Amino acid sequence: LGLTEYWFRYGVTEVFVDISDEVRVEKLSTAYSNVRYDYSVISKIFDGVAEGESIAIIFDYASNREVDLLKSLIAEVEARGFEKNKLKLLTSSWRINSKILEEELGEVLKPYRGCIVYPWSEDKTEYSGVMVSRSIIDSQVRIYLSSILPHGVLGYPSIGDSLRLSGWVGNGLVRDDDCWLKLRDELNLMGICIVGDGVYSGYLYEFEDECLRDAERKYTVKIKDEADIILVDCGGWPWDSTLEDSLHVVNLMCGGVKDGGLIGLISECREGLGSNVFIKALFSHSFEEDSLGVKALKRVADLLGRKKLALVTAIPRSILEKTLHSKGFDTVQDLLTYGFRMYSKQALVRIVDGLAWLTK
């Protein structure tokens, strides 16, 4: 019997594990590496835009896949002769911290440095009963660009959720809120949204609901047998830059592993643990703060009574033992060997490629 190699994203590189063919392995993929779309997805957005109108592209960075769409969108703005000084690139991400966002996209968008606006760099003003960033209100054309992906605390965040979490609109918005629907329609928000291997575009009111339903169809995976061991990465850099931003993946996986089973999280955490608020919660085991990272941590802490967690990470082992009572390893091979010591080679190993919500 031979060995099969399985690869995982780890920071800016990839790491692999060799698993003997006599082990029961089930591989799941929701990575949808190819996004299929016709250029008309982009061109039709601008068909109703008049020359001289000011344009805001609200780019909410959620995966490495939408950067190419952003570049195509900017190329279309240029091809149609719209003035560069009328373009604003409203750039945000609630899935990674602001310093990493600025470094990542500052590089990608270098020629457009002067057009970039971050949510924390400008004032909000009241519009239709909600606090909204000035650049959104002051622009005549508003185009949202992102992906819908599952999140271990939020499930499937709506576009309204993502604008709120990123800081473009005030905190009063909740899902299904009439407030958001009214704002969406009054601002005539347009959008391009990636879901799995497909792309939606047009006015948000035309496709937002369908787009959320499609995300649930594509990323929710029903599991027949709960595994003894799950191995999953967090998407590599920048999504695995800190423990705070990676931990929600544990919650996505917990439905796919049996009680007493092991979730093996492969997350480099090159930038360490995360924000001060998160670090305080991690060491004090108090979860008063309402941040997304702390909510993910609380869920993981609750889960650890029933399931085990181990990590392949750059975070010192002593910290993982002290805070999460979990083991840290240098390689996926070492983590798996540890798993086999607990469950023997008869274990069912589930390998998950991409973000997925596992349910029974």
Sequence positions of predicted segments:
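Short glycine-rich or small-residue beta-strand-to-loop segments that form or flank ligand, phosphate
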Residues: 53-64, 88-93, 231-233
